[in-house]
């Protein structure tokens, strides 16, 4: 069993260079100025609009995304919060390489929300672009227990899969699910704003948003582990307190800190009666 749990999230935007290879010529021309320079933001927006017309949704297929941020909550093997941070890197290549190196060196248990349906396949496609390697991630020496096994959560858990009973139901957006369960959800920035923030040169705002998503996902993970009997009340409350203490001390300038600390305080207060259950756990 791994010594760490890594709850991660990726933020992406359209890969304009990849779009150039596939978009109709008239669309490319409409994003090109009189000097022949292509406006990558305009091209990306046009591609999203074209996707909306064709499919009803503006979200592009996985192979047209590039990574701008990967954030993660690191917890111990029992789920106790250690820290939240963003993977360093001067560009996409370095960010992905550092994330894959972390998996290679520490073999963490990976937890995500729709990671199996988007983040992980997208990351591996982008890794191939840079000829990166991820042998530990693809290790299948244990056929039924590895990073890519869908129905075993020992090494990787996609919370969307598990909470939806493996997609038996739809419509479980992370934002609305978390808000319904008393967490902050997406209180400030939404995923469709990442493109605007990137071209407005606001990487810090993207980082804040990505970290807040991982905090929501981590808290959802705690609730799910509590639900299925993998975690007791004492561990649940102490993990929330550790998260609140860390972000209050180390992430005070982040816009997500106040909403999360307030929600955690309310959660502990509202469910204080469960502390009586702690005696039965011991």
Regions found by a protein language model. Name each.
Residues 2-125:
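Conserved non-catalytic scaffold segment of RNase H-like nuclease domains
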Residues 235-282:
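C-terminal accessory extensions appended to soluble enzyme cores
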Residues 1-6, 278-282:
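N-terminal intrinsically disordered, low-complexity tails enriched in polar/charged
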Residues 33-37, 229, 279:
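Intrinsic low-complexity, intrinsically disordered segments enriched in polar/basic residues
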Residues 19, 42-46, 99, 177-178, ...:
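Generic structural signal of hydrophobic/aromatic residues within well-ordered alpha-helices
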Residues 2-4, 65-89, 107-208, 212-241, ...:
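Metal-dependent phosphoesterase core characteristic of DEDDh/y 3'-5' exonuclease domains
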């Amino acid at each position: 069993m791994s010594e760490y749990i890594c709850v991660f999230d990726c933020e992406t935007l359209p890969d304009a260079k990849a779009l150039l290879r596939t978009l109709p010529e008239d669309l490319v021309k409409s994003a090109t100025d009189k000097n022949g320079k292509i406006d990558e933001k305009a091209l990306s927006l046009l591609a999203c609009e074209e996707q909306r017309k064709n499919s009803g949704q503006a979200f592009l297929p996985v192979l047209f995304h590039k990574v701008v941020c990967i954030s993660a909550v690191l917890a111990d093997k029992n789920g106790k919060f250690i820290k939240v941070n963003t993977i360093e890197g001067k560009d996409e290549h370095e960010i992905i390489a550092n994330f894959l190196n972390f998996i290679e060196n520490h073999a963490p248990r990976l937890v995500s929300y729709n990671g199996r349906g988007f983040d992980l396949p997208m990351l591996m496609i982008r890794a191939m672009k840079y000829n990166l390697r991820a042998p530990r991630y693809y290790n299948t020496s244990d056929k039924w227990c590895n990073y890519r096994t869908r129905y075993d959560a020992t090494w990787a858990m996609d919370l969307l899969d598990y909470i939806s009973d493996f997609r038996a139901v739809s419509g479980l957006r992370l934002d609305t699910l978390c808000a319904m369960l008393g967490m902050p959800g997406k209180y400030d920035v939404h995923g469709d704003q990442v493109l605007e923030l990137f071209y407005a040169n606001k990487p810090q705002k993207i980082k804040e948003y990505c970290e807040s998503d991982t905090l929501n996902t981590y808290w959802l993970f705690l609730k799910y582990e509590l639900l299925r009997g993998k975690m007791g009340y004492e561990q649940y409350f102490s993990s929330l307190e550790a998260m609140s203490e860390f972000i209050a001390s180390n992430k005070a300038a982040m816009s997500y800190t106040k909403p999360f600390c307030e929600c955690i305080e309310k959660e502990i207060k509202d469910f204080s009666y469960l502390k009586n259950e702690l005696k039965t756990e011991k």
